[in-house]
A protein has these predicted regions:
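A charged, aromatic-enriched C-terminal amphipathic alpha-helix characteristic of glycosyltransferases
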Residues: 17, 228-229, 361-365, 374-408
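Membrane-proximal helix-turn-helix segments that form the acceptor-binding/catalytic region
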Residues: 131, 144-190, 204
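Conserved donor-binding/catalytic core segment of Leloir-type glycosyltransferases
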Residues: 191, 233-251, 257-261
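Acidic anion/phosphate-binding donor-loop and adjacent secondary structure
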Residues: 202-203, 212, 217-238
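Nucleotide-activated donor-binding/catalytic signature segment of Leloir-type glycosyltransferases, i.e.
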Residues: 280-300
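Short alpha-helical donor nucleotide-sugar binding micro-motif in glycosyltransferases
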Residues: 296-297, 304-309
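Acidic donor-binding loop of glycosyltransferase active sites
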Residues: 307-321
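Short hydrophobic beta-strand element within catalytic cores of glycosyltransferases
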Residues: 311, 335-338
Length: 410
């Protein structure tokens, strides 16, 4: 097949999980013998991604306009025309290239784009976050998971104390956007990276079917090479805990360290890889001989550090849709500690052995489990092919080959 992958998150020097997922998929599709090109943002050449940007096809940098603010911050309200305008622009760009491909697969943050594509275009989008009904994409506000379906409540996400006009205009923007997204999902094929995302969207939009679920995936061959290299190193003394996360409230790193610090056992060392708006404060509060902050780390270094640890902690307090860091921890053979929320419980199917994914209802119980856990615990390998990009690519190819516009179950 001739396949066009589309993502405004590519290319950038430090790419997030969505971009890496799309590139990983592109490489898997090329390995399977398909022609794959990538339509991305026009801000940088693909070279800024380094080795991560190599996928075996042509890069087309044309997507633009999605960073426009429309003075929403200045006015303290969401503007109803903003997201339809961005979606129309993306659709226009996509349609310039659609005749050259058998299928278009979109990975991005403009879920209403399908609303502006003709029904005969074979278009698939993967939803990686909760941006189908939440302008913040996270369903997380004031340190708590947000489960409100009232569009008027969304006004507080741009202005904590909206006046009547701001509240009414923001509500109108959310109502229109959610309606357009629902029309998009009805008109074209939609993939969710977890059942959690599908359920949460149905909470606002009503019963579906809204799409099908294909979990995130990883390059298991690459991970197993990293794992093997780590196994050849001499064992380190102590209990080494590794966290890779952006340092801001939703990721829960500060809450985890706050709970752990008073109980930190002698010999336990916690290494945090990642940067973010809370990094400076967290360094000042927690950094010491047993808690170290590395700042942003390149992906290869991050995986090497994870492979050398005795345990992985993914302390997110928001509803992670399908955390790649959890998958990486499991496939590296590590006990992986996380909260029982979001799409994370679904990832227990990727355990090598029962109990490898250690889920907890709150941070206190997670920390209690961690500080009493045997750092010498080892896990085997998950079933061959499970969670790998090549298997997911075959699932997605089945969706690609189904008729345009319909829902497809895998």
């Amino acid at each position: 097949m001739r396949i066009l992958i589309v993502s405004e998150d590519i290319p950038f020097p430090n790419m997030g999980g969505l971009a890496k997922h799309a590139l990983n998929l592109a490489r898997a599709l090329v390995r399977a013998g398909h022609h794959v090109d990538l339509l991305g943002c026009d801000e940088h050449p693909i070279d800024v991604c380094g080795e991560e940007g190599k996928f075996g096809g042509r890069f087309i940098g044309e997507l633009n306009g999605h960073h426009a603010g429309w003075k929403e911050i200045s006015f303290g309200m969401f503007m109803p025309p903003k997201r339809p305008s961005i979606a129309r622009n993306f659709a226009k760009i996509i349609l310039r290239h659609a005749p050259n491909y058998d299928v278009i697969h979109y990975h991005g943050h403009i879920p209403n784009v399908a609303r502006y594509l003709p029904p005969d275009v074979n278009f698939v989008q993967t939803r990686h976050d909760q941006g189908g009904d939440c302008f913040r994409h996270t369903r997380f506000r004031e340190g708590q998971i947000c489960d409100s379906i009232d569009p008027a409540e969304c006004a507080k996400c741009i202005n904590p104390t909206p006046n009547a006009i701001q509240r009414a205009v923001s509500k109108a923007a959310v109502v229109r956007f959610r309606r357009d997204v629902a029309q998009s999902f009805r008109a074209h094929k939609t993939v969710f990276v977890s059942d959690l995302l599908s359920r949460n969207f149905a909470r606002c939009a009503g019963p579906g079917p809204w799409g099908t679920t294909v979990h995130n995936f990883v390059d298991r061959n690459a991970l197993e090479k990293v794992r093997h290299a780590a196994s050849l190193l001499p064992p380190r003394e102590g209990f080494h805990v590794f966290i890779a996360a952006k340092l801001y409230p939703a990721k829960g790193v500060e809450q985890f360290l706050h709970a752990l610090a008073p109980r930190l056992p002698k010999g336990m060392v916690v290494t945090v890889a990642g940067d973010g708006p809370d990094e400076k404060r967290m360094r000042e509060k927690f950094e010491g001989s047993q808690i170290e902050f590395l700042g942003w780390c390149a992906p290869d270094r991050t995986l090497k550090l994870a492979s050398m640890a005795n345990a992985i902690v993914v302390p997110s307090v928001w509803e992670e849709p399908c955390a790649t860091t959890v998958l990486e921890g499991l496939f590296l053979g590590k006990p992986t500690f996380a909260l029982r929320r979001g799409g994370t419980p679904e990832l227990a199917v990727y355990e090598a052995e029962p109990g490898q994914l250690r889920l907890h209802d709150d941070m206190a119980s997670l920390v209690s489990d961690l500080v009493t856990f045997d750092p010498g615990t080892r896990y085997g390998f998950a079933a061959e092919g499970l969670g790998c990009a090549d298997r997911a690519a075959q699932q997605l190819l089945e969706i690609y080959r189904s008729p345009p516009g319909g829902h497809h179950r895998v």
